[in-house]
Regions:
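Class I SAM-dependent transferase core
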Residues: 1-66, 72, 105-120
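A short helix->loop->beta-strand "cap" motif at the edges of active sites that frequently abuts
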Residues: 94-96, 160-163
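Active-site capping/gating segments
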Residues: 172-232
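A short, conserved alpha-helix within the catalytic core of class I
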Residues: 147-155
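Conserved SAM/SAH cofactor-binding pocket of Class I
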Residues: 58-142
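Residue-level signal for inorganic ion chemistry
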Residues: 31, 85, 169, 204
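Conserved beta-strand signature within the Rossmann-like core of class I S-adenosyl-L-methionine
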Residues: 162-172
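Class I S-adenosylmethionine-dependent transferase superfamily signal
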Residues: 85, 155-156
Length: 232
């Protein structure tokens, strides 16, 4: 019981009502229940799932562009963070649709089920987002999906318009960030995670490919292709 109220006090920093906290807890319980059938979260994290998953996702709510009509969760999985954020946005009476991209049939079915039960303003795309083009969104969020350089490439190539990209970074986050800035130009701010000393959040804007390295890469590809043709 003490842990329950401790978690509520953490979320209270984001002006979360008791009713909404209860809804978040119900969502957490549904994840654990469904986890017996499909792999939604690590079994090691179920005992601390409120802090490890729900609060961890909720902490980015203040980074969401509330002036936009949509937010996009790429690689949504169990709805972390998409469903959590949708619940919080409704609590704050913010009119925004949450688009969730998850190519797994079983996980997408779970997302549809909880969205319907909690009456959330979501749209579930059971598709491979890497195959989508000219996407438009306000904020884009992603957690435990792909390495940062891959995510930057996806957003730069597949989204024609967006406000910001919010990325959850883990233990090797600093190393991935160092690798990313070698090939990409982008504005970013770091935010310390509330749930782990080893983690942090990135709020990214204006992603651009570093064209010098990109041209060298393209030149290398052309040389390889030319070499193949000469061998034929």
């Amino acid at each position: 019981m003490d842990e329950y109220f401790d978690n509520f006090l953490i979320l209270d920093k984001f002006n979360v009502s008791r009713e909404t906290f209860s809804t978040l807890n119900e969502f957490r319980e549904k994840i654990i229940e469904k986890n017996n059938e499909i792999n939604l979260i690590s079994t090691k994290s179920t005992s601390n799932s409120m802090n490890r998953h729900i609060i961890d996702c909720a902490q980015v709510i203040d980074l969401i562009d509330i002036n936009s009509k949509t937010c996009t969760d790429i690689g949504s999985g169990a709805g972390l963070p998409g469903i959590v954020l949708s619940i919080l946005l409704r609590d704050k009476k913010i009119d925004m649709k949450m688009n969730l991209y998850e190519k797994s049939y079983h996980k997408s079915s779970f997302l549809r089920s909880v969205s319907k039960e909690f009456k959330l303003d979501t749209e579930i795309f059971e598709e491979d987002i890497f195959k989508k083009k000219n996407l438009v969104s306000g904020s884009i969020v992603t957690r435990a999906f792909k390495p940062l350089p891959v995510i930057l490439g996806l957003v730069e190539k597949n989204f024609k318009k967006y406000t910001n990209l919010i990325v959850f970074m883990g233990k090797n986050g600093k190393q991935l960030l160092e690798e990313a800035v070698k090939d990409w130009e982008f504005e970013y701010k770091e935010k310390k995670s509330l749930t782990s000393d080893d983690s942090f959040l990135l709020n990214i804007k204006n992603i651009k490919k570093k064209w010098v390295r990109h041209k060298l890469y393209q030149s290398l590809i052309k040389r390889v292709e030319l070499g193949k043709q000469q061998q034929l």
